[in-house]
């Protein structure tokens, strides 16, 4: 294989994406090279625009645009009384796609985990508590994964909200142990939401 520094660097970068190894990255790079005008040029332009304009909202953790703000918590035309708490944006997208839930989202940015040195201070938990206190929220749905880290995080949030009047519920235990929200099919998600269990009300 020719040692072209730019190509090698691109392969390394693409290999860092989830689910992609060096072989898959090489195939993607070759596809890009063979379709310079159709893929590389518009992709480079779009990536530059995303880098410049798209950020995580500091309030809810969802994606926001410099020009339009956050459609989840700032510019949402609907006034909801529920917040669904998820670990990451992929979880938010999965639940939105299933159409099982209508309400606000709050994206923590991970879980409390000793294995990767992620503490509660690293997550958007304090801003969740502020949203519950300052907005007309009646229910917080804890939609964390059925992993040790996900359940630990859910328990911590439940404990943090115990002195509020808000209803706290958790997705039904039909979720597979160790299962992550973003990998669940629509049927499982719909069942988990409809049969969610109350921690307190």
Model-identified regions with their sequence ranges:
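Cys/His-rich Zn2+-binding cysteine-cluster or related metal-binding knuckle/ribbon modules and their
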Residues: 2-7, 16, 26-92
């Amino acid at each position: 294989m020719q040692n072209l520094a730019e190509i090698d660097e691109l392969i390394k970068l693409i290999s860092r994406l989830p689910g992609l190894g060096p072989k898959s990255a090489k195939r993607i790079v070759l596809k890009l090279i063979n379709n310079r005008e159709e893929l590389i040029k518009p992709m480079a332009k779009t990536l530059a625009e995303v880098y410049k304009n798209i950020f995580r909202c500091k309030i809810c953790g969802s994606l926001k645009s410099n020009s339009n703000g956050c459609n989840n918590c700032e510019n949402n035309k609907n006034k909801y009384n529920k917040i669904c708490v998820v670990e990451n944006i992929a979880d938010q997208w999965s639940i939105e796609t299933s159409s099982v839930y209508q309400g606000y989202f709050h994206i923590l940015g991970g879980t409390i985990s000793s294995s990767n040195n992620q503490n509660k201070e690293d997550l958007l938990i304090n801003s969740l508590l502020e949203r519950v206190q300052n907005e007309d929220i009646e229910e917080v749905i804890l939609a964390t994964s059925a992993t040790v880290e996900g359940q630990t995080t859910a328990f911590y949030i439940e404990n943090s909200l115990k002195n509020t009047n808000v209803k706290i519920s958790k997705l039904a235990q039909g979720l597979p142990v160790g299962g992550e929200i973003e990998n669940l099919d629509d049927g499982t998600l719909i069942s988990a939401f409809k049969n969610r269990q109350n921690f307190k009300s």
